[in-house]
Amino acid sequence: MNLYNTQCPVPKEQQPVHEYTSLKNSWFFCWPTLSRRSYNKKITIALLLNCLLVSPILLSIFPITKLPLKFFFSEFITSSLMTGFILIRLYLGWSYVVKRLMSATVFYEESGWYDGQIWVKPSEILLKDRFIGLYEVFPLLNKIKNTLSFLSLMISGPVLLFFYF
């Protein structure tokens, strides 16, 4: 029996567990839930697609025949920054959900007229939500943070070399 259905006045689409499952099942936000190999593959594909997107613009700024190193460094930096923005969006989505899961209260709107109300979770629902937050969502947030850290380390070298050459 679902505890939310019997005890919760919050509309289903605003319930933290429903928000968690909808993120987990969405095309974009499910990336961190994939295996490490599949997740890295998606991030690498995003990085390569970003390289393809920025290449025409950067070719007009840095002609590859005259400034090949500047072109390659700027392409890597720009595409990495765009991939970083994708990772930040992933992080923000999951951090919103974990905040709602870990909170003892849930803010919700019934009619959409900005008449928001606060519902205090009963202890069994709070325990279940915190369990999901701690053991399901926090590892995903750590995976995204580690990827962002690795990406920022990868950018630092080309940034220094860009200004050197």
UniProtKB/Swiss-Prot annotation:
User: What sections of the protein cross the membrane?
Assistant: none
Into which family does the record put it?
A: Belongs to the ycf36 family.
Supply the name of the protein: Uncharacterized protein ycf36
Organism whose genome encodes this protein: Pyropia yezoensis (Susabi-nori)
The record's Gene Ontology cellular component field reads: chloroplast
* Plastid found in the keyword field: yes
Claim: Plastid is one of the keywords in the record:
yes
Q: Which UniProt keywords apply?
A: Chloroplast, Plastid
Protein location: Plastid, Chloroplast
Give the matching Pfam families.
CGLD27-like
